[in-house]
Design a protein with these regions (language model features):
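Feature captures the catalytic cores and cofactor-binding loops of soluble hydro-lyases/lyases
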Residues: 194-272, 277-280
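Intrinsically disordered, low-complexity regions enriched in acidic/Ser/Thr/Pro/Gln residues
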Residues: 1-187, 191
Length: 280
């Protein structure tokens, strides 16, 4: 099986001129080809691990599936690495009868990089999708203290980041009660922030939890248009980020009724959209 991290020999240089050799741990990044019924659909760069969750979440974000029963099975297909070992870098998905596969306008003409999940889509229209779950009517209340606690809770769960310092994370939380702290439901890490989110959504798909009403998605980096879209398609009413959102992310959050929080650090955050859900 491919690995989420690998050891690599590095040379460390310091300001005083000293040079030392040591082993360092770096995050894994390998291609994953996604096939639908044996037909190539896309190739994405990802950190190996939770691949079926990644594929499931990706299909949700493409508007292909919205429930676990719409996926008959996922299997690793053939493929070997340079040493002749099985690579586990090809996943084939069999969709349930009646599930319409993506049309040609949605197919990826180039690979999907770990930093961009919509790069290579065949048309602008294919980027903006309609959710089966729209979160606009979700009346969940989000306590300020609870939202402020999310980045630290997410950081404490980042095991791969602890060893590599080179991956993004996405964590799904909920608040059981007004006076209760955040409950972590799932955390996933990946070199690509959109992959980490897909892995969380794919976990929820597999567990039969979609739509994800009453939850908050906390991410370790910035909030892009694509992350707001992925949250929207999974029925997640709130997205929080430790860094800034983009202008298009704010616009989409306003249009979809998604609560969007940015610069969530220390004792403050900014609410860019959907502040009516935030309870002081």
């Amino acid at each position: 099986m491919t690995r989420a991290s690998r050891r690599h020999r590095v040379h460390r240089y310091t300001a005083d001129g000293a040079v030392s050799a040591r082993a360092d741990t770096v995050a894994g990044e390998e291609p994953l080809e996604i096939r639908l019924g044996g037909r190539a659909f896309t190739v994405t760069m990802r950190t190996p691990g939770h691949d079926f969750d990644l594929v499931g979440g990706f299909l949700v974000s493409e508007g292909v599936v919205s429930a676990a029963e719409q996926v008959v099975r996922m299997d690793y297909r053939g493929g070997v690495d340079a040493d002749g070992r099985r690579s586990y870098n090809v996943v084939d998905v069999v969709l349930a009868p009646g599930v319409v596969p993506p049309d040609t306008s949605m197919e990826r003409h180039v690979y999907t990089s770990s930093s961009c999940g919509v790069c290579g889509t065949a048309s602008i229209e294919a980027v903006t999708k309609v959710s089966a779950f729209g979160p606009a009517g979700d009346g969940v209340r989000l306590p300020v203290a609870g939202l402020l606690a999310l980045p630290e809770r997410l950081r404490a769960a980042q095991r791969l980041f602890d060893t590599t310092g080179g991956v993004h994370a996405a964590g799904l939380f909920r608040f059981p009660g007004d006076d209760d702290g955040p409950e972590l439901l799932c955390v996933r890490e990946d070199v690509g922030r959109h992959n980490a989110v897909d892995k969380v959504v794919g976990w929820a798909l597999r567990e039969g939890l979609l739509p994800l009403r009453g939850t908050v998605l906390q991410v370790s980096g910035r909030a892009s248009f694509e992350l707001v879209q992925k949250a929207h398609l999974a029925g997640i009413p709130a997205l929080a980020a430790v860094s800034a959102p983009s202008a298009l992310a704010v616009e989409l959050a306003e249009q979809t009724g998604t609560t969007l929080v940015g610069f969530s650090r220390g004792a403050s955050f900014n609410a860019y959209a959907g502040r009516d859900r935030i309870a002081g």
